[in-house]
């Protein structure tokens, strides 16, 4: 059975993983916002399964809806925000040589995490 990890913005669960990939289901509550962050060892690909997202990658803002997807290159500053009135569901795919939850550098976080 997969375990759900609760976060201040919602939750996630790992759907599948291998040596060089990980797939997660992320749920972001309305108004929820992940930290502005980057990763040294992995790139990410996000698929919007349902809801409306504002995604910042570098200096660009992207508004995505159900069935849209976006690639986040390794080392890029990025942020995910639920701009809809329902839960945002994102399928997040990680790719890289070191897939660790601690591979995160936070630049800004509304929940005051480091």
Q: Which residues does each predicted region cover?
A:
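Short beta-strand His + acidic residue motifs that chelate non-heme Fe in jelly-roll/DSBH
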Residues: 35-36, 55-56, 72, 78-85, ...
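A generic "binding-loop/recognition-motif" signal
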Residues: 32, 41-42, 60, 76-77, ...
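Short acidic-glycine-tyrosine-enriched beta hairpin
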Residues: 59-77
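A short, compositionally biased micro-patch
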Residues: 29, 41, 48, 73-75, ...
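A short glycine-rich, His/Asp/Glu-containing loop-to-beta-strand
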Residues: 2-43
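Double-stranded beta-helix
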Residues: 2-6, 79-114
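Glycine- and acidic-residue-biased ligand/ion/polar-headgroup-sensing regions
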Residues: 41-54, 58-59
């Amino acid at each position: 059975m997969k375990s759900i990890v609760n976060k201040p913005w919602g939750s996630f669960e790992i759907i599948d993983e291998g040596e060089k990939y990980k797939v997660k289901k992320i749920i972001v509550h309305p108004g929820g916002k992940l930290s502005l962050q980057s990763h040294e060892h992995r790139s990410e690909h996000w698929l919007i399964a349902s809801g409306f997202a504002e995604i910042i990658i570098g200096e660009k803002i992207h508004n995505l809806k159900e069935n849209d997807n976006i690639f986040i290159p390794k080392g890029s500053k990025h942020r995910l925000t639920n701009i809809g009135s329902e839960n945002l569901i994102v399928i997040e795919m990680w790719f890289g040589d070191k897939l660790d939850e601690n591979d995160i550098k936070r630049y800004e976080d509304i929940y005051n995490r480091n």
